Structures are given as C-alpha cells and as structure tokens.
C-alpha cells in the first residue's frame, strides 16, 4: 500500500500593515496670554530694556537648562523670570564693589561659622521657574537639608541675605519685582547698594525700607548679628588706581 504524504501546510500571509502616522508634536502651551505684545512681556519683567532679553528660547519658554547653556555657550549670565532669559548687567566698578563686599562678608561669616557667601555667579532657584543671581548673598547652613551646599549647578535654595549692586541698566520696576520674588522665596534681608551715591537701601520686607547714607553704618540685623560696616571706610577700600597714581597725575597737571 502506497502512503501519500500531504504537502506541508503553509500559513496564510498576514495582510500588509499600514504604517502608523508619526505622532504630531504638540506646540507648547502659551506662556503668556495670547493677546499680549512684547511691550506687555517687558512690563511683566519690570521694564527691563529689550536688549537684555534673550530671543532664544522664545520668551516664556526658557528653562533652568537654558540658563546654564547661555553661560556655557555664549558666555551670558542670565536670570530666569517667568520663562524668559534676562541678562544680568554689571560694570567693572560695580563688580569691584561687589568683590570687596564678598571679602568683608566672607571673613565675618567664616569667622563665626555661619554659612557661605556667594558672588555674582551664585545661581539659585528661589521659586519654581524663577532663577535669581544676587550680586552677593549669604546663605546660612540651616538652609541646606544636610548642612552642605548641594552639588546641583542651580540649587533650589533662597539666601538669607541678598545684595544687589545697582547699575545704570537696572530699572525701578525690575528691582521691585526682584524684591517681591526674594521675600516670597523666604529671603530675610535685602540690600540694594548704590555705588554712585554710596548708600544702601535696607529692606526687611518689600514695603519696609531704611536708607543708610554715605556717612552711615550698615549692620546685619537679625540675619548677621554683630556685623557692622561703616560705608565711608568701605568705599575708601574700593581701589580704582594704583597706590600713588593719583599723586603722580596731580604732578603732571
């Protein structure tokens, strides 16, 4: 008897699968009301001059990452305000004043083991989506969870004392906005140091200010008990010329 072998069964071919369309990227939500103009955005920022507002990323879309990239790629120091990169401006003389204040504050803070003092590179996330860079600031050790400065390039911490050295590029609205942000974040004391008239505006709240004039003495209040700085002596230490250079210039004239 002959056995007939059945041919192997062949599975039917699956019908062709239509390619799935690529997902369409959704545009980001508008950061500002649709009816706003650039003028409205600038007013929101406190009347900051247009040349200090970065166009990339588009205003309202910037993040903390963009703050770091602006510094590393194009050498611009920017704060993050409402999703907008706003350049910090400081002239050489203002930077010199800030540097001396860092030395004076730093010596006091180190001597008493109070915390740390940062300069104009101290980038801090003071509020969600708000990155501020005080020209000088003091942060007590108690502000840090484990008593250490966090390793992140932009730590989420508000200073106890924030100092801004005023320059020609600052606007009154900008500085008022900073006051609101600082105190909302938990800053206890703000100094606005005006090197032009050699005075300091001392804020303990956005609407509570005392002015120390050029002959006065600045103190640390409850934030830095025992700290005192005579403004005449301080500004006398801000050297803008080599020792004896002024006398030589007088001889030449």
Protein language model regions, located:
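Gly/Pro/Ser/Thr-rich low-complexity, intrinsically disordered segments predominantly at protein N-termini
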Residues: 2-253
């Amino acid at each position: 008897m002959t056995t007939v072998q059945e041919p192997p069964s062949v599975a039917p071919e699956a019908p062709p699968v239509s390619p799935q369309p690529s997902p369409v990227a959704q545009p980001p939500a508008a950061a500002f009301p649709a009816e706003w103009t650039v003028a409205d955005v600038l007013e929101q920022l406190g009347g900051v001059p247009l040349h200090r507002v970065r166009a990339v990323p588009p205003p309202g879309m910037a993040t903390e990452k963009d703050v770091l990239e602006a510094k590393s790629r194009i050498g611009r120091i920017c704060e993050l305000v409402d999703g907008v990169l706003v350049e910090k401006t400081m002239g050489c003389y203002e930077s010199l004043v800030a540097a001396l204040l860092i030395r004076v504050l730093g010596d006091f803070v180190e001597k008493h083991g109070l915390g740390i003092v940062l300069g104009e590179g101290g980038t801090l996330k003071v509020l969600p989506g708000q990155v501020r860079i005080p020209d000088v600031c003091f942060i007590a050790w108690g502000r840090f969870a484990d008593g250490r400065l966090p390793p992140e390039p932009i730590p989420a911490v508000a200073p106890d004392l924030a100092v801004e050295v005023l320059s020609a590029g600052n606007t009154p609205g900008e500085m008022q906005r900073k006051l609101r942000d600082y105190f909302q974040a938990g800053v206890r004391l703000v100094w606005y140091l005006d090197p032009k008239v050699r005075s300091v505006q001392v804020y303990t709240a956005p609407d509570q200010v005392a002015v120390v004039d050029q002959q006065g003495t600045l103190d640390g209040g409850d934030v830095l008990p025992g700290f005192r700085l005579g403004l005449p002596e301080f500004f006398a230490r801000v050297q803008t010329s080599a020792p004896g250079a002024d006398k030589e210039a007088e001889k030449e004239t």
